[in-house]
Each structure stands twice: as C-alpha cells, then as structure tokens.
C-alpha cells in the first residue's frame, strides 16, 4: 500500500468569509503529501490554465474537490474547471482519453441544510448521493475511482437565525476526521 500524492482543489468564491470550508481546509493544508490550491484565488479572472491543471492531475493520485454545495451543485468556477480541464482526449473517452485512469476522486462539501433535509421526502427531496451523481458520473467517465463524499451539514454563515447551524467546534471535529482520513488514505 502506498501513500497517495494528494491534490486538494478548494473552490470557494469567498473563503475569507467562510466558516466551514475555511476551517476544513486550514486543518488539512499542512499535510506533507498534500498540494493545496485555492482555485478562486489562483484564477480571479476565471481564465484557467488548462495545461497546468492537467499536469497537476497527472502528478497526483487522490484528487480532492472541496467546495460549498450551492444550489445542489458547485460554485461556477468548478464547473468551468471541469468543462475546460477534463477535456476529450485527456480525461475521456475510454481508450483515448485515459490520463486519469486509476486516480481517486473525493468530494468534500458543506451544506447549509441539516442532514435530514437531504432524503427522499425531506426538504430537498433527494439524498446527497443522488444530488452528487453528476460528479460521480464525471469521475466514472474519466476512469477514476469515486470515493464516498465527506459532507458537513448545517454550516451557515455566523449570525443567521432560525436555522440549525453547527458551531465552529463541531466543524473542527469534522475537520479532524477529514485530516485523519487523508493521513490514513492508501491507494488500493
């Protein structure tokens, strides 16, 4: 079993005003086998350097996509990144674009809603697993192993009243579990 080279791509349009993603990323960014990137900070104009991004993917084994779960999806720069970087001939189709075959994909998200809102018949009508299917299928098409996502629920900005909102201490507990997961992860 080998220790993976980890690429953590943080996609948050305003990380300085974040609670959840800020705490999560700060807790793991110093891991020795991890390359940490704040993609919004790197591309404030959204002009993605495709060749650079593809090389980063080639140089790593476990690719982590960390972001808030906006409108049942991701921040716009992550969608742009997927459209540009995971291009035909590089990431797909099988047998032609197979550069990512065997790499692992981990999604790490924060939601504003509580866990029970993400179920059949719940406020959001669908489970997180169902809502993340487009990402899972993207990983599948690219020949990557989809890992069960890490989800931190009920993370709202400070000062929002009337909704369940976990404390920074609770977020830190999730951040510790996230760190332990990355530290102990092996490529199998």
Q: Where do the language-model regions lie?
A:
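Structural signal for conserved beta-strand scaffold positions within catalytic alpha/beta enzyme cores
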Residues: 8, 36-38, 107, 148-151
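Helix-loop-strand module that forms the ligand-binding subsite of alpha/beta enzymes
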Residues: 51-136, 142
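A short, flexible beta-alpha/helix-coil linker loop
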Residues: 13, 112-116, 154-157
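Residue-level preference for long, well-ordered alpha-helices that form the structural scaffold
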Residues: 17, 49, 124-131, 163, ...
């Amino acid at each position: 079993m080998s220790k993976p080279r980890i690429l953590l791509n943080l996609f948050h349009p305003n990380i300085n005003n974040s609670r959840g993603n800020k705490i999560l990323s700060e807790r793991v960014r110093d891991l020795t086998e991890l390359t940490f990137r704040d993609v919004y900070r790197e591309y404030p104009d959204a002009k993605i350097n495709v060749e650079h991004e593809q090389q980063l993917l080639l140089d790593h084994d476990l690719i982590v996509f960390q972001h808030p779960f906006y409108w049942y999806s991701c921040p716009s720069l992550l969608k742009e990144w997927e459209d540009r970087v995971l291009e035909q001939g590089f990431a797909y189709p099988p047998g032609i674009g197979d550069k990512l075959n065997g790499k692992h994909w981990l999604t790490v998200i924060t939601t504003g809603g509580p866990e029970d809102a993400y179920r059949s018949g719940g406020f959001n009508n669908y489970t997180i697993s169902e809502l993340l299917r487009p990402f899972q299928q993207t990983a599948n098409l690219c020949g990557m192993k989809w890992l069960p996502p890490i989800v931190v629920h009920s993370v709202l900005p400070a000062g929002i009243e009337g909704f369940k909102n976990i404390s920074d201490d609770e977020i830190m507990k999730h951040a510790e579990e996230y760190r332990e997961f990355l530290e102990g992860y092996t490529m199998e």
